């Protein structure tokens, strides 16, 4: 138990250090600017950094980024193999977070390495995958046949407004995950993560350590 506490303490220090800039690099000017960037089509997003991202699934494709005017050139947004990759090309420190707004016709996957807040709405597809390493906060709403979540670190993932027929969750670390699954839920937990579910699915679970699988209380109960 002492070893686990030490690991979590060190992890927290690393996350806080990254957020506030132990190696700050370029200092933000404080002058906010909004850029629109033209991008090729993509079906998945990879975020490496501490960005606040809002994604809406709709017919048109658009990308807008807001932040300090001298910081925006340091953020790379490239599409390769149908994946939009968002990352820093140089370290920086800022007083307000970088804000990214995206609309995309079809989003099938999200990969996050780092922190930040990500909100995805309007999904309607056959499968949606989330793979994250770090301490992001993620919210997703819409409908899908299969939701597949793989986490390590201290993620907070709220998909209880993403209606799915099947859910697959593999959580390592101290994550908190909330899902809405109708038919089948497969859960593997390693460590003190908590998975909460809504619905009445058939459950297959494997839990190593103090992790928990809990049914969400009915609203208004």
Which ranges hold each PLM region?
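Positively charged n-region of N-terminal signal peptides that target proteins for export
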Residues: 1-4
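C-terminal motif of bacterial Sec signal peptides marking the signal peptidase cleavage site
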Residues: 14-17
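Extended, compositionally simple hydrophobic/Ser/Thr-rich segments
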Residues: 35-36, 42-55, 92-102, 106-221
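Short linear S-[DN]-x-LW-Φ motif typified by the pepsin-like aspartic protease active-site region
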Residues: 19-91, 97-103, 198-199
């Amino acid at each position: 138990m002492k070893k686990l506490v030490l690991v979590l303490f060190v992890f927290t220090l690393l996350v806080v250090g990254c957020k506030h800039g132990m190696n700050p690099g370029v200092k933000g000017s404080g002058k906010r600017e909004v850029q629109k960037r033209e991008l090729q089509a993509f079906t998945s997003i990879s975020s490496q950094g501490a960005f606040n991202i809002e994604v809406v699934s709709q017919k048109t494709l658009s990308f807008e980024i807001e932040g300090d005017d001298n910081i925006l050139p340091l953020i790379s947004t490239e599409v390769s193999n149908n994946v939009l990759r968002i990352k820093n090309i140089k370290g920086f420190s800022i007083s307000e977070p970088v804000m990214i707004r995206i609309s995309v016709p079809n989003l099938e996957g999200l990969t996050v390495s780092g922190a930040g807040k990500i909100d995805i709405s309007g999904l309607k597809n056959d499968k949606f995958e989330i793979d994250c390493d770090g301490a992001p906060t993620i919210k997703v709403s819409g409908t899908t046949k299969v939701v597949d979540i793989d986490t390590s670190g201290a993620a907070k993932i709220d998909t209880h407004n993403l209606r799915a027929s099947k859910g697959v969750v593999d959580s390592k670390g101290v994550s908190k995950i909330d899902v809405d699954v109708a038919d089948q839920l497969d859960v593997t937990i390693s460590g003190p993560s908590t998975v909460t579910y809504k619905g009445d699915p058939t459950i297959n679970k494997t839990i190593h350590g103090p992790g928990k699988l809990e049914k969400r209380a009915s609203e208004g109960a």
